[in-house]
């Protein structure tokens, strides 16, 4: 990646506030930990379906990647689908079959479904391996695709599900699942979690944590008032807070200031608002 001009100025080895999901930089709040524990329990106990809801920018994608890695480390067969807007149930089914290592697929939907079921049986029932599919941005799944997923989590032995499914989704999924036609799917959810916005204390802790990872243990340059300003403008959203912190570093570097005060954060936030316009800012967060 390109060297950022402010890294040396602030004594950083890496970019502290990148919005690219990275497990190393992911700060686990109590709420993230709870969602992680509940979801890991559903998967580990092979109970089937877990859902994690949250607004955009609350850390769903980071948590999805962290869970995926945790499952791989535990020896599970885990697959992560990050953009599930498939045109047909058949295309989603073929993707899932390939991702989970099904030896072959069939021309027909029914054929592929049977092959996947046999594969899941061999892995989960015979070999005793936990098989898990994690889907990020699951709010884009149409009802016909949700119906396919319901079929897949119906595959079971006498005491456990063959496939464990974890959905990470924006709140639209709640509305979709409220439809009477999806009552069957909804009733399969074993545990649901919701990621909320950060508190001011959590934002303080997140900035401190990320700066320590990027600097090798040093303290960040934001005053307490500057952190409060980031909190106010980001409204507790982790992604927006990281963007504001990053932009503030750049401006502080240009002004050759080693300490970052609230007025600098305010001007960065103002500049961001004016350049994005409110509508674009909302679109940008999508």
Annotate each language-model stretch with its function.
Residues 81-85, 176-177, 190-203:
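Conserved AAA+ ATPase "SRH/arginine-finger" region at the nucleotide-binding site
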Residues 5, 212-286:
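C-terminal alpha-helical "lid" subdomain
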Residues 45-67:
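Walker A/P-loop nucleotide-binding motif
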Residues 1-46, 282-286:
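A short, basic N-terminal segment
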Residues 7, 88-92, 103-148, 156-161, ...:
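Mid-core helix/loop region of P-loop NTP-binding domains shared across ATPases and GTPases
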Residues 98-100, 171-172, 180, 198-217:
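Conserved AAA+ ATPase "sensor/coupling" helix adjacent to the nucleotide-binding pocket
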Residues 68-71, 173-188, 197:
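Short regulatory helix/loop adjacent to the ATP-binding pocket of P-loop NTPases
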Residues 12-17, 76, 87-106:
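Conserved NTP-binding/hydrolysis module of P-loop NTPases
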């Amino acid at each position: 990646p390109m060297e950022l001009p402010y890294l040396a100025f602030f004594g950083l080895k890496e970019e502290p506030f990148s919005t690219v999901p990275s497990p190393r930089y992911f700060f686990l709040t109590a709420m993230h930990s709870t969602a992680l524990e509940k979801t890991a329990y559903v998967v580990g106990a092979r109970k089937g379906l877990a859902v994690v809801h949250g607004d955009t920018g609350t850390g769903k994608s980071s948590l999805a990647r962290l869970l995926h890695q945790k499952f791989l480390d535990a020896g599970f067969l885990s697959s992560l689908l990050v953009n599930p807007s498939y045109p047909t149930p058949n295309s989603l089914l073929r993707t899932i079959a390939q991702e989970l290592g099904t030896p072959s697929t069939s021309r027909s939907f029914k054929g592929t479904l049977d092959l996947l079921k046999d594969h899941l049986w061999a892995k989960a029932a015979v070999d005793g391996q936990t098989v898990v599919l994690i889907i990020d941005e699951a709010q884009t799944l149409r009802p016909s695709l949700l119906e396919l997923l319901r079929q897949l989590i119906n595959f079971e032995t006498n005491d456990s599900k063959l496939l464990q499914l974890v959905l990470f989704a924006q709140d639209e999924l709640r509305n979709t699942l409220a439809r009477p036609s999806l009552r069957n799917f909804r009733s399969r959810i074993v545990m649901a979690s919701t990621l909320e916005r950060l508190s001011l204390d959590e934002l303080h802790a997140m900035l401190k944590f990320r700066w320590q990872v990027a600097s090798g243990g040093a303290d960040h340059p934001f005053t307490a008032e500057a952190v409060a300003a980031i909190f106010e403008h980001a409204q507790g959203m982790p992604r927006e807070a990281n963007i504001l912190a990053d932009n503030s570093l750049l401006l502080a570097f240009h002004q050759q200031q080693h300490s970052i005060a609230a007025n600098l954060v305010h001007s960065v936030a103002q500049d961001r608002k004016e350049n994005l316009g409110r509508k674009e800012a909302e679109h940008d967060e999508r």
